[in-house]
Amino acid sequence: MFKVFRKEMMWGGRKLVLETGKVARQADGAVWASYGDTVVLATAVAAKAPKPGVDFFPLTVNYQEKAFAAGKIPGGFFKREGRPTEKEVLTSRLIDRPIRPLFADGYRNETQVIVTVLSHDLENDPDIVAMVATSAALTISGIPFLGPIGAARVGYKDGQFVLNPTLEQVEASDLDLVVAGTTEGVLMVESEAKELPEDVMLGAVMFGHREFQPVIDLIIDLAEMAAKDPMAIPAPAYDKDAVKTRMAALIGQDVRQAYTLTVKQERYAAIGAAKLKALETMVAEGTAPEAVASVFKELESDILRGSVIETGKRIDGRTTVDIRPIVSQVGVLPRAHGSALFTRGETQALVVATLGTNQDEQIVDALEGEYRESFMLHYNFPPYSVGEAGRMGSPGRREIGHGKLAWRAVRPLLPTKETFPYTIRVVSEITESNGSSSMATVCGSSLSMMDAGVPLPRPVAGIAMGLIKEGEKFAVLSDILGDEDHLGDMDFKVAGTEKGVTALQMDIKITSITEEIMKIALAQAKDGRVHILSEMNKALNTAREAVNQNAPRITVINIPKDKIRDVIGSGGKVIREIVEQTGAKIDIEDDGTVKVAAVDGKASEAAIKWIKGIVAEPEVGEIYEGKVVKIMDFGAFVNFLGSRDGLVHISELKNERVAKVTDVVKQGDAVKVKVLGFDDRGKVKLSMKVVDQTTGEDLSKKEEAEG
């Protein structure tokens, strides 16, 4: 019934298996891939004809993790998987980025890739095997995919690169880098590092590229057995060269003139006018509108790229290494815990840091198990930032991806929870955008956290690099504009400190990027990063000495483990009362660590005093303040140490005979008592008569001194 094709190899110490022909046979391409005990199914399906009127490639990648893969039942009311998690969105982007440039020119059929995690061994992150399976599924599908690609994860520990480290090894590694590409070159890099030098980062990229070559060979071997006939791509219904020649004669000079305008809005208006002129004239001459739109993009790209290669001058008049003017401000929002406004040319980010307690941590339910995240960074890109009116809603894939990149860039500099027990949320509102808004977020995040009093050892900055390559000639561009990103060959984002790189993200549209070009780009990025850091330092070069006055003050105390239940109380009664009475937030951990947080210092002091009173043991001979809580014929019960009560016997009320307890004290009276000792049941025996009720002086010691 099944015609199964299978290929396998040992890779990075584990067996990689690719199989097709048994599952999802109605998809154009389907590959069942396993690595260790992690199993994914990747499918690729394409529409049989292109979408009419579409001038772009409609590709969708959906990566999904099934709870059953880790032997779990989903939480929530419905007990089934819901909207994509952040991990699923990020992995979908990770798969999409290296495959998108490899589809044939002119291919416009709607294409969907679905990757499903079916088994997770809790050792290998499924993202690498998902990328490999996707590459294999596309390669055998007949879809015009000019792959295959390979992918690998690279760690770095004790001066050695590690291929496909386990989840446990990644935690201990100085580097977590994912690289993907073809036999010829690297197409995509995503990484987080602990301030590593540029040569180590480049070495990791090239190490990964070498190590995934056998995977590409394995996919080719599978395709030789199982690949379907390639899909035919219809030839354009027009003569592209003729249309391009006519358009260049008609508006070529207008487009060149438009690209001399340094203000983005003016430039876009001029380009729009040139495009409209071409459309009206050439459609009237009989050219199809879609032909005009498609060729206009090529003409625009040729003019921009040729100008940079020939003159070394860019759209806004800068040289290839110049950084746009930078203005940094901190403390721009009076009630925020930390805030910064970072402006670089026409890109601007308003970044705000907020400090919270353990109760504000994000609870993440992942396949690997539930964990708590104490650092969050959220990136928002409203339509007004590019002068447009658009939809507002939940964050899209791009916003989630940009936020995660900035999160990776800053996280290696964060203090430990032991030294800074706060939950940190950073929000970046992009208020203007013309390229490199994610790197503006990195700069603004660093400034806002230092403004909030987060003790970062050094500021962090980021820069976006670009590349234009024509034949053997190339130009590496520092601090790219939006147009240079869209029309260039590379988007290369580097973030770090003066010591080294903390995050690196690379997307390359061509396969001929050499190691030498990447080396030049990294060196140029370092120079740019150092310049940006020097500009940021003019606003704030080190963290504030204390957290902002509007932020909660967290005080950490330790109590004996056997006293935790006393502080919490039956059903949480005691801790609720402390919180309600003092206004402080209280977190108690299993090891007896207690974190008390309050904006008002007095509230924090009151809560700490209360807790210490509960856990403190009364000492014989010590004098305490207390309150009469119960009257009996034989004496009065006094609450004197947190929730602890003791008995003042009627004979210990006064230095004279007392007929009735109520003659001396009444319920609710504030009194001063001395601990005499404990009875045989452990109950505390107290005395009032040996304490001066006005001054709190120990009268028994006074008598001894006088005697």
From Swiss-Prot:
Mg(2+) binds at residues 485, 491. One of its GO terms (cellular component) is cytosol. Keywords: Cytoplasm, Magnesium, Metal-binding, Nucleotidyltransferase, RNA-binding, Transferase. Gene3D superfamilies: GHMP Kinase, N-terminal domain, K Homology domain, type 1, Nucleic acid-binding proteins. Its cofactor is Mg(2+). One of its GO terms (biological process) is mRNA catabolic process. Its EC number is 2.7.7.8. One of its GO terms (molecular function) is 3'-5'-RNA exonuclease activity. Residues 621-689 form the S1 motif domain. CDD domains: KH-I_PNPase, RNase_PH_PNPase_1, RNase_PH_PNPase_2, S1_PNPase. Residues 552-615 form the KH domain. It holds the Pfam family PNPase. Belongs to the polyribonucleotide nucleotidyltransferase family. Involved in mRNA degradation. Catalyzes the phosphorolysis of single-stranded polyribonucleotides processively in the 3'- to 5'-direction. This is Polyribonucleotide nucleotidyltransferase. It comes from Rhodospirillum centenum (strain ATCC 51521 / SW).
